[in-house]
Swiss-Prot record:
Any one of the GO CC terms: extracellular region
Alphabetized UniProt keyword annotations: Secreted, Signal
Gene coding for it: Kap
Record organism: Rattus norvegicus (Rat)
InterPro entries: KAR_prot
Protein name (database record): Kidney androgen-regulated protein
Signal peptide: 1-18
Locations listed in the record: Secreted
Length: 120
């Protein structure tokens, strides 16, 4: 359906560019009216054919009681460090304590910086 709309608009633009010096205002108005009628009829058809479904899908795995995905809690999380070869297991309470303390600052080692001085 989108291709149809793009095609109609493209044809309209091509006709407008192809005949700019001719007095075709009446033809352009008729063409515009027909384009708008076509677009309105297709959009009305699409809206009429769409009927929203209020009933849940009839799937055996659908459970209405478990809709909140944020209830899942994990007892441990895995943190992978770039410096170590393996993974460290850190308890979630430790992560919560670290994120709750906003007073402490974390310092990361920076790469060696080289300063160049230019003499003029």
């Amino acid at each position: 359906m989108m291709i149809c709309k793009v095609l109609v608009i493209t044809v309209f633009c091509v006709l407008t560019v192809a005949f700019p010096s001719l007095d075709i205002d009446s033809i352009n108005e008729e063409l515009q009216d027909s384009i708008f009628d076509i677009l309105n009829s297709t959009s009305d058809f699409q809206l009429a054919s769409y009927e929203p479904s209020t009933s849940p899908p009839e799937d055996s795995t659908y459970q209405e009681s478990n809709t909140d995905f944020m209830q899942t809690t994990y007892s441990k999380s895995i943190q992978i460090s770039e410096l170590s070869n393996g993974a460290e297991t850190v308890s979630s309470s430790f992560l919560e304590e670290v994120t709750e303390t906003s007073e402490s600052t974390v310092e990361f080692p920076l790469a060696e910086t080289t300063t160049f001085s230019s003499t003029s």
